[in-house]
Amino acid sequence: ASAAFYLHAMVGRQSLYLWDNATYYNLQVRLESNFADGVFTGVGSTIYKTWFNDYAPLVINLLAEPFFMFTPRTANTFALLCALLIPSLVYYSAWLLLTVLRRKFQPKAPVLFTALSMAFVLLLPLLHIALYRGMPDLLGVAFAFMLLALGVGYDFSQPTPARLVSLAAFTGMLMLTRRSYMFTVVAFFLLYGVWALARAVRARQVQTVLRFGRFAAASLVCVGVPLLPMFWRIAKADYSDRYATYQTGGFLAELANQRVYLGWLVFVIMLIGILYGLYNAKARALSLIHI
């Protein structure tokens, strides 16, 4: 249904795409041009932009290139490609997360739980607004869902190398998709780490604490060190002038903006779900994860 909507919306009109669409479209064209000059030029340019540019082609553009190369290479076809490719990854990762949650919490009506949750994801206005305008950085939502799916119920009490490697890999891809997703990474691992360490200390599981520490150290070496120039540039940059136009008025004003984008219905549904989940002891953990 979503694919049909995007296909009708973008093929049946002529649009002028601005902001992120133009940025990523230019990155896509330059990516091809750089690799046309040689493999080393393409790889070097991609690494340089990843380290020192706010928008990097390493995840989104490399993912889109195997499909983009067979199109007329216009901004409209790039937007259409993103609107058809990215939702499939977001919906698939959401389905995987819901599958994990079903196994973990065993709801009384698992089919209804999955159907309503997927419907909520499919109908989320911000998802459609971003892709309707040809903004591909929504891809990070798929990686965020995968992080949640990998973290649910895992407390480092057992060695699972594949899970830990996947956690580190999806963390890196999420940060590279868009710089602002770093806030998601920090919040996720802060809460996740506190939860895992608290459980380990409470149960006096020394090996669990050591396993968590080794994972944190290995992740910093494998993900943090290669991206250190990017972190250093972000730490030195002053984004106040750039984002002052979009984010004004503080936290309450930002909530008001989200209400306008999401609409009253979605806002009320989310509020009711959160309050009921916090009230119901059996659903409290699930509600905290969604928050």
Regions found by a protein language model. Name each.
Residues 1-18, 121-125, 219-233:
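Transmembrane signal-anchor helices characteristic of membrane glycosylation enzymes that use polyprenol
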Residues 10-22, 35-59, 73, 80, ...:
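Membrane-proximal lumenal/periplasmic loop motifs of glycosylation machinery
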Residues 74-105, 146:
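Transmembrane-helix motifs of polytopic, lipid-linked glycan transferases
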Residues 104-108, 145-164, 174:
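Membrane-interface transmembrane helices that cradle and orient dolichyl/undecaprenyl
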Residues 126-139:
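Short acidic/glycine- and proline-prone juxtamembrane loop motifs at membrane-interface regions
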Residues 289-291:
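Conserved small/polar residues in nucleotide/adenosyl-binding loops
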